[in-house]
Amino acid sequence: MNYEELLAFAGRNPMLSAALVGLTVALIVTEIRRLFRGYKGIKPAELTQLMNAGGAVVVDLSASGDFEKGHIAGSRNAQASAFGPEHKLVANAKQSPVVLVCRSGNASETAAKALKKAGFEKVSVLEGGIPAWQQADLPLVKGRN
């Protein structure tokens, strides 16, 4: 397809062309924002490797009731509304890997931005949260610990 044919197609299909341009711009903006957000999104398999290597602080920002119903082994619970860089779970972990987990990803992303702003170097968010962990057929433990 040459340039003239492309222009002719766009002229015959303005809605389709506008949708293509809009989606392309949205994709570019999303990727640029992801690159500059300051923290890393990791998949369940990456979190498993990080936990097995030791030293990672995994903080589950789910409500305490949801945490007790099922959480990643070794994770600690903190209420999203009370969590910040000074929280006792992460206060001494500025150089350690900190992985934030929640049910939807929203609370984790907000907390990750705050930690990065406070100087934490290795902040990650579990992409897809607990549902992604379950979808990867990885176990959850019940109870408080």
Describe these PLM feature segments.
Residues 1-41, 50-56, 64-97, 106-145:
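Rhodanese-like catalytic fold shared by cysteine-dependent sulfurtransferases
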